[in-house]
Amino acid sequence: MVRAKRTKRASVTDIYRGCKAAGTCPPDVINKVEHTTIADKILQYGSAGVFFGGLGISTGRGTGGATGYVPLGEGPGVRVGGTPTIVRPGVIPEIIGPTDLIPLDTVRPIDPTAPSIVTGTDSTVDLLPGEIESIAEIHPVPVDNAVVDTPVVTEGRRGSSAILEVADPSPPMRTRVARTQYHNPAFQIISESTPMSGESSLADHIIVFEGSGGQLVGGPRESYTASSENIELQEFPSRYSFEIDEGTPPRTSTPVQRAVQSLSSLRRALYNRRLTEQVAVTDPLFLSRPSRLVQFQFDNPAFEDEVTQIFERDLSTVEEPPDRQFLDVQRLSRPLYTETPQGYVRVSRLGRRATIRTRSGAQVGAQVHFYRDLSTINTEEPIEMQLLGEHSGDSTIVQGPVESSIVDVNIDEPDGLEVGRQETPSVEDVDFNSEDLLLDEGVEDFSGSQLVVGTRRSTNTLTVPRFETPRDTSFYIQDIQGYTVSYPESRQTTDIIFPHPDTPTVVIHINDTSGDYYLHPSLQRKKRKRKYL
């Protein structure tokens, strides 16, 4: 079966051309071609009051106005994340040279008095081109708006040199230097030098010098001192001579107004005198193990319960609680922490007593507010800390070889230096020829000495003072080129090897069904080797 060919339908314009003359055009075709549809009429009436310019919003062509449509994401502007487009002016084509032009002179009028005979002359045409003027335009690269200082050129008369005035690239700016010093109260440098005139022992030193180093010309020094004015110096108070009274810091990170706290439902439930019984507890178990105050039971010390506790008991039996204040307590809430008007921390628990039980099984009892106020933590007296090896007074330098002690010894009384001896021997009992008088009874202490081994006599000696420190180890280096005796300390212990019996590690099983055990081949008795005759 062959499919019939589809005939192309006539357009609206072709139908309008054929039916307009006969007057048989449909209304929709006439409105479409003559632009009399409802949409066209709305635009016609609206354009009388509103002008949209050349936007092209009509039934005309969709050209987008004079500039045309701009696709989304494109345009002459700067794209997001891209390089800005630099707009450069168009380049004018350069003219290499003028074209060959033949100059033509204008026709001059003939003078009537001139002769009628015209002398012929050879006239040549100048076909050579004139001076060629070359014009080349260089378009500068567009730059940012920057201020450029242009030098000023001053020209004088003929024969004089030009003066070039170069201005500064930027005018000098006024600068101001400020210094601020902050003192750290947690760090204080303590000086050990002897305080001089006008110097304090703290970190803030004030040094006052008198002008005594110069020379006075033209008069005695007394006249200068008499005419000068003496300024009485006042002592500035140290920054540690006063105390800063700071306000009381807040007790909580987010303080709550007392009016809002007093209106809370929890506070009304705890401190309602008409509905809640107030009981002050003095037993410390109320803070950690309140269940031990209600009934005798075993508590797990590793478990801290901060939830509501319910105690079940048989009302037919009378049980005495460990604490009389917790009699008939059936329910005890979790701990609540509040603040008293005196500023103490109060631990509260809201409980309910099961005093009466009805026939229906309902238990009736009053609410009880158990509370305990925590005591004040007394502030311990501060302990004055002593600095180790430092002090703020005068420093004392002790030089042993320089200092000497003079001891007045009487020859007649050689034993007078002995401490605790009251009697003085007579001259007859003293042997002046004895060598015991020359003995030095001083005890030498070599606990802090150092042994130096060397043969050079030109070795420089560096004396290092020794200070008392809490550490026991001290390292003294006398000279880099000298000899140093080091005694290394070894703490390696010798491993003790315990003897073990020589038992083979390989066990050989023997298929022996005669017994329920087996012997190692090394434990079996060796058989004697017999010679056969």
Swiss-Prot record:
Keyword DNA-binding: yes
Disulfide bridge map: C19-C25
GO terms for biological process, alphabetical: microtubule-dependent intracellular transport of viral material towards nucleus; symbiont entry into host cell; viral penetration into host nucleus
Assembly and oligomerization: Interacts with major capsid protein L1. Interacts with E2; this interaction inhibits E2 transcriptional activity but not the DNA replication function E2. Interacts with host GADD45GIP1. Interacts with host HSPA8; this interaction is required for L2 nuclear translocation. Interacts with host importins KPNB2 and KPNB3. Forms a complex with importin alpha2-beta1 heterodimers via interaction with the importin alpha2 adapter. Interacts with host DYNLT1; this interaction is essential for virus intracellular transport during entry.
Subcellular location: Virion; Host nucleus; Host early endosome; Host Golgi apparatus
Function: Minor protein of the capsid that localizes along the inner surface of the virion, within the central cavities beneath the L1 pentamers. Plays a role in capsid stabilization through interaction with the major capsid protein L1. Once the virion enters the host cell, L2 escorts the genomic DNA into the nucleus by promoting escape from the endosomal compartments and traffic through the host Golgi network.
Any one GO cellular component localisation term in the record: host cell endosome
Organism the protein comes from: Human papillomavirus 9
Post-translational modification summary for this protein: Highly phosphorylated.
Protein name: Minor capsid protein L2
Record motif Nuclear localization signal, residues: 1-10, 525-532
Higher taxonomy: Viruses, Monodnaviria, Shotokuvirae, Cossaviricota, Papovaviricetes
